[in-house]
Swiss-Prot record:
The lineage of its organism: Bacteria, Pseudomonadati, Pseudomonadota, Gammaproteobacteria, Lysobacterales. It is found in: Cytoplasm. It comes from Xanthomonas campestris pv. campestris (strain ATCC 33913 / DSM 3586 / NCPPB 528 / LMG 568 / P 25). One of its GO terms (biological process) is arginine biosynthetic process via ornithine. One of its GO terms (cellular component) is cytosol. Belongs to the lyase 1 family. Argininosuccinate lyase subfamily. Transmembrane segments: none annotated. This is Argininosuccinate lyase.
Length: 431
């Protein structure tokens, strides 16, 4: 490994120690490399504004940074173990091509605020993707709730048959959940949309850095003012972003659980498209719902990433090398979470209900609540009506139909009044 920015003359670096220090940092930095380049361009512009760089030097740096970005995208430049991290790779390339101008690029900044700003830009993009996918899932669910509002579905509590419900209610529940997930991702975006570049190692520098320019140039909503807080926010903002992602993957896990049950032979309420299933290596008869099972497992990866960062943050103020480990947590957590969420809209759009199976699972006892409420409306104290309905639950369905039960469920949000217009207005507000 070459290009150690911190190496002192005459001090040897033990290879094993350096390998331990670097870990898989340079591989993870491939996620942040283009963001680091963008921030380096903005930083160079700020240095020119205060006279550290000439216009000619700025032009050369900007050109080389653009070329490096192009080479990285095309594969002509590979960020690998020749470098300690993405920061040293950028400085090495600029120094090789431009000499002194490349050696000036790090004036007024530290790798601490360098990775902070690159990570912050990366998190903003990831949160926008969480919001977009949550919005897309909500749209599918709203459309299907409208189309299948009157399709009877058995409602369960404790995984036991409970009351008559509808596909519309099932879909409306997920629509509202993912609208909230999009709102949460957008709110978290606003939290992290603050520029730490120019805070250096956490104590500022003796230069009048043009932080207002880098804030505007990089598209941040505001300046992160305190250098101390800039360091305190590392890990805190990553944790908030993972919590926003986790809200979506938690709901994904519960959808996947429903579908795991509903596609089983014991329920057989739902048929999945063939591309969402696999087979067995030994049992020719099997058609396994592996996609939804791995979707269900995804939240564990996101929760593990969140837990790792929570444990890392048992630190005093200031920068500590422990925080390097937060990179792997967010990269792996978001990779798993977004990969699963990407598949969800199409899966939901293409699953098929089996109306005959749904209807056959609605038994007489599932009308008992209707009987009790109707008696209460007629003047019988509800607790007495409840006891009478419980005693006669086996015959509660006589003369009743699932459609009749759904039509009577008029409380706001229930089957006869899904209030999809309210949910659609909330969805439209996300656009």
């Amino acid at each position: 490994m070459t290009n150690l920015l911190w190496q002192k003359p005459g001090v040897a670096v033990d290879a094993k120690i350096q390998t331990f220090l670097a870990g898989d940092d340079v591989i993870l930095d491939r996620e942040f490399f283009l963001y680091d380049i963008a921030a380096s361009k903005a930083h160079a512009q700020g240095l020119q504004h205060i006279g550290i760089l000439s216009l000619e030097e700025l032009g050369g740096l900007s050109e080389q940074l653009d070329l490096l970005a192009d080479d990285f995208r095309s594969g002509a430049f590979v960020l690998d173990a020749h470098y300690e991290d993405c920061h040293s790779a950028i400085e090495a390339r600029l120094t090789e091509c431009l000499g002194d101008a490349g050696r000036k690029i790090h004036t007024g900044r530290s790798r601490n605020d360098q990775i902070l700003v690159a990570t912050r830009l990366w998190l903003k993009d990831k949160l926008q993707r969480v919001a977009a996918l949550s919005t897309e899932v909500a749209k599918v669910a709203l459309d299907r709730a409208q189309a299948e509002a009157e399709l009877p579905v058995p409602g369960y509590t404790h995984i036991q048959r409970a009351v008559v419900s509808s596909a519309g209610m099932w879909w409306a529940g997920w629509a509202e959940a993912f609208i909230d997930n999009a709102v949460r991702a957008n709110d978290t975006f606003k939290l992290v949309d603050t520029n730490p570049l120019g805070t250096a190692a956490g104590y500022g520098v003796n230069l009048p850095l043009d932080r207002a320019h880098t804030t505007a140039e990089l598209g941040f909503a505001r300046l992160q003012v305190s250098p101390i807080y800039a360091q305190l926010s590392r890990g805190k903002f990553e944790l908030a972003a993972l919590e926003a992602l986790g809200g979506a993957t938690l709901d994904l896990r519960r959808i996947a659980w429903d579908l795991s049950l509903f596609t089983s032979g014991e329920f057989a309420f739902v048929a999945l498209p063939a591309q969402y299933t696999t087979g067995s290596s030994i049992m020719p008869n099997k058609r396994n719902p592996d996609v939804i099972e791995l979707m269900r497992a995804t939240h564990a990866s996101v929760a593990a990433a969140r837990t790792e960062i929570e444990q890392l943050l048992s630190l005093p103020s200031g920068y500590h090398r422990d925080l390097q480990s937060s990179k792997g947590a967010i990269v792996h957590g978001f990779a798993r979470g977004l990969a699963a969420l990407e598949l969800l809209p199409a899966l939901l759009a293409n699953l098929e209900w089996r109306p005959d199976k749904l209807r056959s699972a609605i038994d007489s006892g599932m009308y008992a609540t209707d009987v009790a409420v109707e008696a209460a409306v007629a003047g019988v104290p509800f607790r007495d009506a409840y006891k009478a309905a419980a005693a006669a639950s086996d015959s509660a369905g006589q003369g009743r139909t699932p459609e009749g039960s759904l039509a009577a469920r008029v409380s706001p949000g229930a089957a006869a009044d899904l209030q999809l217009d309210v949910l659609r207005a909330r969805w439209e507000a996300l656009q």
